[in-house]
């Protein structure tokens, strides 16, 4: 079936995979402008309790269907993702209704930042408050529900900002201060990042413990190249924003003993390399662009540049020293950037994925079905 037929099928059948209280739930499929002005189709199943309802994006679900996943499994996976976000769980830190979103005092402790590219988000940034750093934009979001690995969020737009009645500085400081408790910093060698990513699957395949798997993986990864570190958060989701914090910039400089390069691997993490005379900025930039073009999904690209931190002056800047773009300047530039780059070390995150184990999904047959 084509994409439009797929959307119709999902809308017609997804309620069969949900508990009975959802059998008469209203649904809607709307387009949403996401990071890098990527437009996705989002399915919203309105919560019968009147609380916030998550949006499950169908584009990546259709890709899995095209790759051979059974349509019933695809629809079941979408239903799992919905339940994962909507049902209160002990480990979930916050669930609230629509009216509470409008109250700054209620949501302020659950506001967190994300970072994106200014030029690639002209449309999206036209209706949301942001703070510019070099050619990057820090935006602000409310952790609506979910746990650290499955975060449902609401973007703070200009209308909400007006209702809150707080300054940009207040909003920015609140979001930055919340980062450590919402999803703490993770700074480690790239080798350890790869070990952590591969260990679980490898342990299952080989029937060994996680620690044994990690030891075997460490032994198979070459470590004779330059020192490379990964900066993200524990959830490895939208963790690149940590490099925007001045205290984190200084912490990294202290650990590495001086200046360093920052490679924008994706919106989820950055790679850090200590500066050396043998390291060519142009070579790094070429690598960033090539890997981004081949490995990073369009929605997860952060930047086409390489950045640097000067430990003496405590300054973070883009290496080619382009003047900072204002939003109006960015509006006048094409969004067809040369080559979408970046070094991605984390797996692409599919927004409709649930954290439940994969299994064969059978529809829940409600009365009258």
Regions found by a protein language model. Name each.
Residues 289-328:
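TerminUS-proximal long segments
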Residues 265-303:
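C-terminal structured domain segments
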Residues 4-223:
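Extended, low-hydrophobicity segments enriched in charged/polar residues
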Residues 226-240:
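Short glycine-/aliphatic-rich beta-strand segments at the starts of folded cytosolic domains
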Residues 31-35, 267-270, 306-312:
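A glycine-rich phosphate-binding loop feature that marks nucleotide/adenosyl-phosphate handling sites
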Residues 258-262:
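A short linear hydrophobic-aromatic micro-motif
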Residues 240-254:
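Short amphipathic alpha-helix segments
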Residues 329-369:
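Non-Sec secretion/translocation targeting segments of pathogen effectors
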């Amino acid at each position: 079936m084509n994409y439009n037929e797929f959307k119709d099928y999902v809308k017609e059948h997804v309620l069969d995979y949900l508990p009975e209280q959802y059998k008469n739930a209203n649904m809607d499929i709307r387009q949403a402008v996401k990071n890098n002005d990527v437009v996705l189709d989002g399915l919203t199943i309105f919560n019968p309790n009147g609380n916030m309802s998550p949006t499950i994006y169908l584009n990546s679900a259709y890709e899995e269907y095209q790759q051979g996943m059974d349509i019933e499994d695809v629809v079941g996976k979408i239903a799992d993702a919905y339940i994962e976000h909507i049902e209160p769980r002990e480990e979930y830190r916050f669930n609230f209704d629509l009216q509470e979103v409008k109250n700054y005092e209620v949501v302020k402790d659950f506001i967190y930042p994300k970072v994106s590219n200014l030029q690639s988000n002209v449309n999206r940034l036209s209706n949301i408050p942001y703070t510019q750093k070099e050619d990057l934009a820090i935006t602000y979001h409310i952790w609506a529900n979910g746990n650290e690995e499955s975060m449902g969020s609401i973007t703070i737009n200009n209308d909400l900002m007006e209702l809150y009645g707080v300054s940009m500085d207040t909003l920015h400081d609140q979001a930055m201060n919340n980062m450590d408790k919402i999803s703490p910093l993770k700074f480690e060698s790239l080798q350890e990042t790869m070990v952590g990513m591969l260990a679980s699957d490898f342990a299952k395949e080989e029937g060994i413990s996680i620690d044994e798997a990690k030891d075997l993986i460490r032994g198979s990864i070459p470590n004779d190249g330059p020192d490379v570190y990964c900066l993200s958060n524990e959830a490895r989701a939208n963790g690149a924003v940590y490099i925007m914090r001045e205290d984190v910039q200084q912490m990294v400089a202290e650990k590495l003993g001086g200046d360093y390069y920052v490679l924008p691997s994706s919106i989820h993490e950055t790679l850090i390399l200590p500066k050396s005379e043998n390291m060519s900025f142009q070579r790094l930039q070429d690598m960033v662009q090539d890997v981004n073009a081949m490995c990073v999904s369009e929605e997860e690209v952060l930047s086409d540049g390489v950045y640097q931190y000067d430990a003496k002056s405590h300054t973070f800047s883009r290496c080619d020293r382009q003047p900072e773009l204002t939003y109006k300047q960015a509006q006048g530039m094409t969004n067809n950037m040369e080559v979408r780059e970046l070094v991605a070390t984390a797996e692409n995150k599919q927004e409709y994925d649930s954290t439940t184990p994969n299994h064969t999904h059978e529809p829940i047959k409600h009365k009258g079905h």
